[in-house]
Design a protein with these regions (language model features):
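Ribosome-associated RNA-binding proteins
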Residues: 1-137
């Protein structure tokens, strides 16, 4: 599964989880981090283009942002909120490319595919991918 295949959201998103057996679990551990309170500045992460972001990429961005904020402001010096939720199912119709594969696969017949990952669609200049408030200037 390559990320470039799922970067653009073509067509209607598929989010009907009740019809699929073996749904992938969401990899995002927490949607809020730090300590709630009043803060001086707000740092926001926004997207430059309309795209789909996989849940693994959202989790890695959250981890790196929280680590950077924790190093500069301390454990209780910030509060971060993740505003997007990956609810779109990404499916893949796996193809076998070895000798004798024509006897094992059906090609495009019954090509619904298996659910392999989750993603969130983000619009251009969407300001709520992540928001962090901190007491000091970062």
């Amino acid at each position: 599964m390559h990320g470039g295949c799922y970067r653009t959201g073509n067509g209607q998103p598929y989010a009907r989880k009740e019809f699929i057996k073996g749904k992938p679990q969401i990899k995002i551990a927490k949607f809020q981090g730090g300590k709630k309170g009043e803060y001086d500045c707000i740092v926001q992460l926004c997207s430059n283009e309309k795209t789909q972001i996989r849940h693994m990429a959202i989790e890695s961005a959250r981890l790196s942002a929280n680590k950077a904020l924790e190093q500069t402001t301390g454990e209780t010096g910030y509060f971060s909120v993740l505003r997007i939720y990956p609810h779109i199912l990404l499916r893949e119709n796996k193809m076998i490319a070895t000798a004798g594969a024509d006897r094992l696969q059906e090609g495009m017949r019954r090509a619904f595919g298996k659910a392999v990952s989750l993603a969130a669609r983000v619009k251009t200049d969407y300001m709520e991918i992540g928001r962090a408030s901190c007491r000091e200037r970062v």
